[in-house]
Amino acid sequence: MSALTLFSVTDPQTPVWHSTDAKAIQAQLNAKGVRFERWQADRDLGANPSPETVIAAYQHAIDKLVAEKGYQSWDVISLRADNPQKEALREKFLNEHTHGEDEVRFFVEGAGLFCLHIGDEVFQVLCEKNDLISVPAHTPHWFDMGSEPNFTAIRIFDNPEGWIAQFTGDDIASAYPRLA
């Protein structure tokens, strides 16, 4: 179940607000300029689908976003617990960073935790299958896939080069709860 937990940057262990209600999550995030919607990830992808299979199954969703915002490229990130690079990838994504473009993800399988550092607050958004999130350009954030990752998400970009991060050097992420 999708969830949003809100923290103050002054107390990273005590939640200020928490909800699993999609409308409440959407309202909180929309107020900060973050798009959050529940879409339908209802296509049968089979076991370990190829990126091409995922793209073909959800081309209609990609086309909708391209028509709305003019995105130029997309790909699929899919990580499982047996991935030999899971620890290195987790550490990379756990470092606070920004992008020069919106970070758009549509989760079609599994879950991951987006943590958004907005002003003096941290919004931990547990995204699961059916969730679309768009983090605005230049928003400091990090992503936790957990120690045993299990997710597939379509990534959509303004930049044809794909995922390009500017790391902030702030170790704020280490103070907040992580996925198991």
Curated annotation (Swiss-Prot):
Which sites bind Fe(2+)? Answer: H97, H99, E103, H141
Record note on cofactor: Binds 1 Fe(2+) cation per monomer.
Show the InterPro entries listed in the entry: ARD (IPR004313), ARD_bac (IPR023956), RmlC-like_jellyroll (IPR014710), RmlC_Cupin_sf (IPR011051)
Entry keyword annotation includes Metal-binding:
yes
Provide the site residues for: May play a role in transmitting local conformational changes: D102
Essential cofactor(s): Fe(2+); Ni(2+)
Q: Where is this site: May play a role in metal incorporation in vivo?
A: E96
Its Enzyme Commission number(s) read: 1.13.11.54, 1.13.11.53
Question: Which GO MF terms does the UniProt record name?
Answer: acireductone dioxygenase (Ni2+-requiring) activity; acireductone dioxygenase [iron(II)-requiring] activity; iron ion binding; nickel cation binding
This chain's function reads: Catalyzes 2 different reactions between oxygen and the acireductone 1,2-dihydroxy-3-keto-5-methylthiopentene (DHK-MTPene) depending upon the metal bound in the active site. Fe-containing acireductone dioxygenase (Fe-ARD) produces formate and 2-keto-4-methylthiobutyrate (KMTB), the alpha-ketoacid precursor of methionine in the methionine recycle pathway. Ni-containing acireductone dioxygenase (Ni-ARD) produces methylthiopropionate, carbon monoxide and formate, and does not lie on the methionine recycle pathway.
Q: What HAMAP family does this protein map onto?
A: Salvage_MtnD
* Subunit and interaction comment: Monomer.
What protein name is recorded for this chain? Acireductone dioxygenase
